[in-house]
Amino acid sequence: MHYPNLPALIADSKRTLTKGPIALVMIEDDVEVDSTLSHLGTFDFGNIIAFCAPDRTLPQTSSEVLHRVDYDVTADNALPDIANALIKALPDMWFYYCYNAEYLYYPFCEHRNVREMLGFMQEERRDSIMSYIVDIYARDLTAHPNGVDHVTAHFDKSGYYALARKDAAGVELERQLDIS
């Protein structure tokens, strides 16, 4: 389905977005759009909504779960505006968001789809679960001019790290991390 704007999607949401969870993909440029959408397709999302400029070309697909919305994702507050509008329209739905060339990983994602992860969360009475969004940078930009390498990916130079989260008194909280 192709929507000309966010209000058109919202108006149709009760009919077309009844199956969750829903992945929101902000497509800023042409880098790894196909692989990002394919990656999300392996997790059994009920719907995948790609937000992108009207002149952007998306991969041809027969997928009934992929929707396109024409939207300027580079505008100030684009992501919060989109997310808040959809949360208001579908308050009981679980949403995940990412940008193109970002890849979702969560515990046991190699063998469990996102619905199974959410079932686990519900059984455990959890409101959230630790997951990672990973940029897979290329070491050799001559060989990979788009900056992405699926085979020998590297983290960026500043790195990513986790520090123990502390309470107001400075005491480390069990099993809680601040990821930077």
Question: What residue spans do the PLM features occupy?
Answer:
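Catalytic-site signature of metal-activated, phosphate-bearing donor transferases
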Residues: 108-180
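Short acidic/polar active-site loop segments enriched in Thr and Asp
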Residues: 46-47, 93, 127
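Short acidic, S/G/P-rich loop/turn micro-motifs used as interaction or catalytic elements
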Residues: 29-31, 102-107, 136
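N-proximal low-complexity "stem/linker" segments adjacent to membrane-targeting elements
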Residues: 1-34, 38-41
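Active-site-proximal specificity loops/subdomain of glycosyltransferases
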Residues: 3, 17, 51-98, 103-119
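Short His-Asn-centered micro-motif
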Residues: 25-29, 51-53, 98-99, 131-132
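Short loop->beta transition adjacent to catalytic acidic/histidine clusters or analogous donor-positioning motifs
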Residues: 19-22, 41-51, 66
